[in-house]
């Protein structure tokens, strides 16, 4: 699910100065630690196609790629405000997904037995959450729908049932998608946001979720 960000040099030069990918944390390095070669990966499901979720695709030469149709259509022809997010060629960059074919989905779908997706737009036009069934329960890999678990908390004094993140494309979609995520997930433990600080501990622990 997703392939992560670029190296530190590209991230700092073209995207967010100060962004760092620690040595050993690139997706291909993490897979190598698990004894998996990128060429052995058969499928990649993307929550969305922002630059920090699609890097190193050139290493996954045998993988089928899965994404929502609306996300793909916007990624290849974004408005100027999102040129950087999708590394649009006019900036002198080549999108990681350039020249690759995708299997496109229109809404909720089962991709494999025990692995499904449902739309969670808001952070991007066609953002989706990936659900993986395990012996422990269904884990919701929600990409950038939330950035921290605090986004799931209500704010009673403001009558908010969530605390939405500050970065979004459409706040109405974002709000409704987070509410939907909370409704579907068994508990917070079963929600895995890409950028939550706790994810580093999860990666370092090399935990395997269920079976």
Placement of each model-derived feature along the sequence:
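Short, conserved loop/helix-junction motifs that constitute active-site signature segments
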Residues: 58-61
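C-terminal/domain-terminus segments
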Residues: 76-83, 90-92, 97, 152-153, ...
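Active-site gating loops and adjacent loop-to-helix segments of metal-dependent hydrolytic enzymes
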Residues: 10-13, 18, 148-166, 208-211
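Active-site metal-binding loops of divalent metal-dependent hydrolases
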Residues: 3-6, 49, 70-71, 123-124, ...
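Metallo-beta-lactamase
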Residues: 22-36, 40-52, 64, 69-119, ...
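Conserved beta-strand hairpin/beta-sheet module of binuclear metal-dependent hydrolase folds
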Residues: 1-29, 129-143
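Divalent-metal (often Zn2+) His-rich catalytic cores of metallo-beta-lactamase-fold enzymes
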Residues: 111, 131-133, 138-139, 149, ...
